[in-house]
């Protein structure tokens, strides 16, 4: 298990160094994205002025407060609570995020499916997991909301955060076919089969 300090944008070679159970801490730029954002971009053809190539995105729709624009709050938004949402709803967007936008890292909770794992392997990407219920802690890692695009979708806008020490995050899916979710599922199925056999129950 290795630890990595990364400052996006990162290269394919860097993301392929990551292995399941490694930890990653991010510095610099992090983009916030959610269901409506990706529907707008990939289903409805809306463009963004942000270059996501080599970057990390986090599945979030942050709670923010409108304030006067200043050096501290350049967009006129102050972060209140920036937490992570469940990723599984956005499974179908993993491949286009990597293939069309050049995203390298996806941060979320709960994991993604086999289609995403295949995309990570083919295109060079990884999924970094956050434990649910840590939004207050995550918010302390965000120094500022630097910019926002597609803001008519608020709060599911496309956010550009400046982060410091964002992590450690666990590499839960890597570009080599590794997935803690697949491993847990296989282990649970094995234990279920053993328990049923011990009870004399035939598994269906």
What are these regions (language model features)?
Residues 1-10:
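Short, structured beta-strand/loop micro-motifs enriched in basic residues and often containing a Trp
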Residues 12-17:
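Short, surface-exposed secondary-structure edge patches
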Residues 23, 29-33, 175:
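Short, charged beta-turn/beta-strand-edge "cap" motif at the junction between a beta-strand
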Residues 32-167:
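Feature captures the catalytic cores and cofactor-binding loops of soluble hydro-lyases/lyases
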Residues 140-204:
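C-terminal binding/interaction regions
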């Amino acid at each position: 298990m290795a630890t990595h300090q990364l400052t996006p944008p990162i290269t394919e070679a860097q993301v392929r160094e990551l292995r399941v159970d490694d930890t990653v801490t991010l510095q610099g730029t992090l983009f916030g994205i959610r269901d409506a954002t990706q529907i707008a971009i990939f289903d409805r053809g809306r463009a963004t002025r942000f270059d996501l190539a080599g970057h990390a995105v986090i599945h979030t729709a942050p709670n923010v407060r409108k304030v006067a624009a200043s050096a501290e709050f350049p967009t006129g938004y102050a972060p209140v609570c920036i937490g992570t949402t469940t990723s599984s709803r956005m499974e179908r967007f993993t491949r286009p995020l990597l293939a069309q936008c050049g995203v390298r890292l996806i941060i979320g909770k709960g994991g993604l499916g086999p289609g995403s794992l295949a995309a990570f392997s083919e295109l060079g990407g990884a999924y970094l997991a956050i434990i649910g219920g840590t939004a207050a802690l995550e918010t302390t890692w965000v120094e500022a909301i630097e910019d926002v695009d597609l803001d008519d979708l608020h709060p599911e806008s496309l956010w550009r955060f400046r982060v410091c020490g964002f992590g450690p995050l666990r590499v839960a899916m890597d570009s080599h076919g590794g997935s803690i979710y697949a491993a847990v599922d296989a282990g649970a199925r094995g234990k279920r089969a053993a328990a049923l056999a011990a009870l004399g129950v035939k598994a269906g």
